[in-house]
Amino acid sequence: MTSLEDNSQLQPEHSTTSFQPPCCRHTHTSDTHEPWRSLLHNAAPKEHIVQLYQDEQFLNRAVCRFAAAALAHGEGVILVPTAAHWEAFCPRLEAEGVDLSAALSQGQLTVVDADELLPRFMGEKMPDAPVFLGLAGEVVARARSRDRYPKVRWWGEMVNVLWERGNATASMALEDLFDQLAHEQEIAIFCSFLMDNFNGEVHTRMLPRLGQNHSHLIPVEDYFRLESAVADALREVVGPVEASVLEKKLLEQYAPPFAMPSSQALLFALRQVVPGVADAVLQRSGTLYRAS
């Protein structure tokens, strides 16, 4: 991993081929079940996307999809991982056709250690907004390489580091700053949280807050399995007739706080409108999703 002053340390020693725009060759899984792949592939400036994950392979696939697509599009890419995750990303990126040494040396890819950058703008418990925006602006300016790569994407997990430390307040304050950064710098931002989408506390406290500073939610890896699990769980909990009426009514009348799969929006709506059955449907949905 590297400091802000030196990106060269990240170049893999074993990669010697000349740089070619990376492509996502390994696309055996249909985007029908995983629309998040298209969302990340085509991430646009000012979009702020959040992923919930428990499986490290899901994290790796999503981040490398986001980064490899940007490199293929001729965009600058900023990654701010922990050292352990950067080590896991490298072989995946190379398998997708990315020449890491060339991407780093040419300035198209900028990688900064999350554990190195985070203390530089954190106060006692909360992020210092002016310091963060100044440091982040420096990273974005580097990624643009004097307008060689005017379009830039950023993925990072400093917000998750704070979340895993138990400092949810600071994590959400930092997300607010990232949302500000996305709009001021006109970049796409993607972040990932180690959260269980079928946890009641996450649905009650964290997802509504994430809806205040994100444009899109990626709640699970397989949207088709989620849709099936939620539909079956709702039928089991309230009965098939009531489930049909309730689903139609909620999806028509309730607008989720940010873009998400319709089945996820249904879980949101249940908690807002019929809280008495929300936890039962959520827990059963999780059981069915994991078993499918």
Which residues are covered by each model-predicted region?
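Non-catalytic regulatory/interaction regions at protein termini and inter-domain linkers
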Residues: 2-292
